[in-house]
Amino acid sequence: MSPNPSSFGKVAVLMGGRSAEREISLMSGSGVVQALRSQGIDAHAFDPAERDLGELKTGGFARCFIALHGRFGEDGTVQGALELLGIPYTGSGVMASSMAIDKVMTKRLLLSESLPTPRYVLLRRGGYSPAQVDAIVDTLGLPLIVKPAREGSSLGLSKVTERAAMAAAVALAEKMDADILCEQFISGDEVTCPVLGTGEQARALPVIRIVAPEGNYDYQNKYFTDTTQYLVPCGLPAGEEAAIQQLVLQAFRTLNCRGWARADVMIDQATRKPYLLEINTSPGMTGHSLVPMSARAAGISYEALCVEVLKTALLDHQPRDGSLP
């Protein structure tokens, strides 16, 4: 049964923000505002880069749909502010958000539960020598991936195919983060799988297989070209897809995520073993975004998806009577 639109109260769609992914967030948020309004919900755009978060309280907002991406949006920062304001919000809580945005912490948590993720080496700004950078090639082999530990949308990511390119790749990643993740490259199918819900009620949506030009699924190919192919149904054997969905649900629960998320996975071409790369706790909602695409394959329209996500808005610390403000 669909909830009465008025039961949501006045909704702020947080969008824009201060991260390197601001442009994408504005695109996501605009789509969400339009979708919620089409369902009769009193939704308003709210850019934390231009307005004080305190206005959410004084403005009478009852809950927030977080369409922010990257720093200050999906890293636990805005979630903590909303906890203090007592305004329920979509997506994961403070701790899960801060863990999931950090690719190294995510890997450590996954490995603690024996979930597969590519081998890696962590570099910290100012804490490594050229010789140590060079040695990473011997440790992980070529090609390998170098990326900032806490950025999304493939920003600052390099695929290193020769030893001489390592220093430049590390320097690029270091411009965006003090922590640099050097990761084993898994050659094979690149897939992604969204999750909707919380706890035991969480469910995995259809897997999407991504085929990018020259295998390069970078920022440009993610959002601004039509040459990347998104295959859903993914074309994998049913058993493989089910195994990926189960693995993604395990990862979602390991990080204590809630509401919704999307996990990126590589499938080793030789062994067909899936490897978890990262979990995005505030996925994109643009025209090129993958969660709406997967939801559509499951029979869920963009508008219905936005309402479904909004219904999951919570606080880490609920009032004693379990009610929402």
From Swiss-Prot:
Note on how the cofactor is bound? Binds 2 magnesium or manganese ions per subunit.
Residues annotated as binding Mg(2+) 1: D264, E278
Q: Which cofactor does it need?
A: Mg(2+); Mn(2+)
NCBIfam families recorded? D_ala_D_alaTIGR, PRK01372.1
Quote the record's binding site residues for Mg(2+) 2: E278, N280
Give the protein's function: Cell wall formation.
SUPFAM superfamilies, per database record: Glutathione synthetase ATP-binding domain-like (SSF56059), PreATP-grasp domain (SSF52440)
InterPro entries in the record, alphabetically?
Answer: ATP-grasp, ATP_grasp_subdomain_1, D-Ala_lig_Van_CS, D_ala_D_ala, Dala_Dala_lig_C, Dala_Dala_lig_N, PreATP-grasp_dom_sf
Its localization reads: Cytoplasm
Tell me the classification of the organism that encodes this protein: Bacteria, Pseudomonadati, Pseudomonadota, Betaproteobacteria, Burkholderiales
Q: Name one GO molecular function term.
A: metal ion binding
Gene3D superfamilies (UniProt xref): 3.40.50.20, ATP-grasp fold, A domain, ATP-grasp fold, B domain
UniProt-listed PROSITE patterns: ATP_GRASP, DALA_DALA_LIGASE_1, DALA_DALA_LIGASE_2
What PANTHER family is this protein classified in? D-ALANINE--D-ALANINE LIGASE, D-ALANINE--D-ALANINE LIGASE B
Q: What is this protein called?
A: D-alanine--D-alanine ligase
Which amino acid positions bind ATP, per UniProt? Answer: 137-192
Which family is this sequence assigned to?
Belongs to the D-alanine--D-alanine ligase family.
A Gene Ontology cellular component where this protein is annotated is: cytosol
> Pathway it belongs to?
Cell wall biogenesis; peptidoglycan biosynthesis
Top enzyme class, one word, equals: ligase
Q: What is its EC number?
A: 6.3.2.4
